Amino acid sequence: MITKPIKNVARKKRHAHVRRTITGTPERPRLNVFRSSKHIYAQLIDDVNGVTVAAASSLDKELKLENGGNVEAAKKVGELVAKRALEKGYKTIVFDRGGYVYHGRVASLADAAREAGLQF
């Protein structure tokens, strides 16, 4: 019997492989992206101390989004997480795409964060 591969299992495998090399430090935290079908989430993580430094998602009340699962929502989340990171004094980060393809919502979040002032 042929079984269809599950996309999320393959994504988690890719993410685990990348996480062996990418770590966030107190000076340069890791910008992690999680994408669901209805929303997108981004958080800056200091892996040395195990602390989330800043976070933003399409569920935030500040954004007042009707649809959190599109490219425009990802762009606004990228701007918001960059604003929160800059307020806390972080300018350079490490981008962690979470095993997702750098395309669509993930790419627009990254581009918006770059345009808002984060360097990666």
Swiss-Prot record:
GO biological process terms, semicolon-separated: translation
GO molecular function: 5S rRNA binding; structural constituent of ribosome
Keyword vocabulary terms for this entry: Ribonucleoprotein, Ribosomal protein, RNA-binding, rRNA-binding
rRNA-binding is among the record's keywords: yes
Transmembrane found in the keyword field: no
One GO CC term on file: cytosolic large ribosomal subunit
Pfam families from the UniProt entry: Ribosomal_L18p
Family: Belongs to the universal ribosomal protein uL18 family.
Summary of the function given for this chain in its UniProt record: This is one of the proteins that bind and probably mediate the attachment of the 5S RNA into the large ribosomal subunit, where it forms part of the central protuberance.
Subunit structure as annotated in this protein's UniProt entry: Part of the 50S ribosomal subunit; part of the 5S rRNA/L5/L18/L25 subcomplex. Contacts the 5S and 23S rRNAs.
Protein name: Large ribosomal subunit protein uL18
